A protein has these predicted regions:
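Contiguous, often N-terminal, cationic amphipathic patches that form binding interfaces
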Residues: 2-57, 69-86
């Protein structure tokens, strides 16, 4: 299972998202200090009812908690766009 599949599986199980997009932007960071570790840079757009009435900072903490160990082993940087469904 590649990194995007790992992230997708965790986020789908944790948040039952209405929308989920995961973009690997690692190629944009080749040569940067953080890229030397081999970990990835990702952009995630996720929309879930579980975010309703939850401040943005708490939504991000929820995602970080769900991703858990992947933040140490596979993810160097992650940009989050957390929304509630329309």
């Amino acid at each position: 299972m590649n990194r995007i599949e790992k992230i997708r599986t965790i986020l789908e199980q944790s948040f039952r998202p209405h929308q989920l997009e995961i973009i690997d932007e690692s190629h944009l960071h080749v040569g940067h200090q953080g890229a030397k570790s081999g970990k990835g840079h990702f952009r995630v757009l996720i929309s879930s009812e579980l975010f309703r009435d939850t401040p943005q900072v708490k939504r991000h903490k929820m995602v970080f908690k769900a991703l858990g160990e992947l933040l140490n082993t596979d993810i160097h940087a992650i940009s989050l766009d957390t929304k509630i469904p329309d």
